[in-house]
């Protein structure tokens, strides 16, 4: 068994309840099963490649176009641009999902996992992510992560690499999470087995 430390995020809907939990809480879980994230879908690969290329070529073009001191300023600012456009989305992007100790951990590539309780899980079903409005997060750069909204699901969180084949998890108070494990069916079985509910698949 392995252990993982992570943060337990809170949802805006939870903040309206009389007993409001802490905004973040560090917790440890014993990992019982790990599900790698699905390969990055084609659209995301294109967005990632083009954005990364633009982040490299744009400063070079500006450097060549600016004389003297201005060119030096562009050169100094280039690393900050690369961090903002490329490194930050990579660090926060999903790498996989771990299940155990009554929690689901969303494993991220460069920072602590996010933990979601499985004991109160209402349903888990295989589905595709509909066209959605990105409210905060990444809309294809190394995947889809952050807060989104659409007409059918309302507001939800996503940590996915493939919108076509994923799993929608639902909790009380309207909390929804879309993920894209490589094996959605096995993932559904694992989370439902630890939720104490049959749920939908």
Label each PLM-derived region with a short phrase.
Residues 96-98, 168, 178:
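Short, surface-exposed charged micro-motifs
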Residues 80-125:
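Conserved beta-hairpin
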Residues 67-80:
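Hydrophobic alpha-helical transmembrane segments
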Residues 1-69, 171-176, 189:
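N-terminal membrane-targeting/pre-transmembrane regions
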Residues 11, 16-20, 24-28, 107-175:
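Non-transmembrane, membrane-adjacent beta-strand/coil modules in membrane-associated proteins
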Residues 173-201:
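Cytosol-/stroma-facing membrane-proximal "stalk/adaptor" domains immediately downstream
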């Amino acid at each position: 068994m392995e252990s993982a430390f992570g943060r337990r995020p809170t949802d805006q809907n939870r903040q309206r309840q009389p007993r409001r939990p802490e905004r973040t809480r560090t917790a440890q879980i014993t990992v019982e099963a790990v599900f790698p994230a699905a390969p990055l879908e084609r659209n995301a690969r294109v967005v990632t490649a083009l954005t990364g290329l633009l982040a490299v070529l744009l400063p070079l073009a500006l450097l060549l176009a600016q004389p003297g001191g201005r060119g030096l300023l562009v050169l100094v600012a280039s690393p900050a641009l690369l961090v903002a456009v490329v490194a930050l989305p990579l660090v926060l992007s999903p790498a996989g999902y771990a299940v155990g100790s009554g929690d689901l951990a969303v494993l991220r590539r460069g920072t602590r996992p996010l933990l979601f309780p499985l004991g109160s899980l209402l349903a888990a079903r295989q589905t595709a992510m509909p066209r959605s409005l990105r409210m905060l997060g990444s809309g294809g750069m190394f995947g889809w992560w952050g807060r989104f909204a659409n007409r059918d699901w309302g507001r939800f969180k996503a940590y996915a690499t493939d919108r076509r084949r994923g799993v929608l998890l639902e909790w009380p108070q309207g909390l929804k999470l879309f993920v894209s494990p490589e094996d959605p069916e096995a993932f559904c079985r694992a989370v439902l087995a630890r939720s104490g509910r049959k749920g939908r698949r």
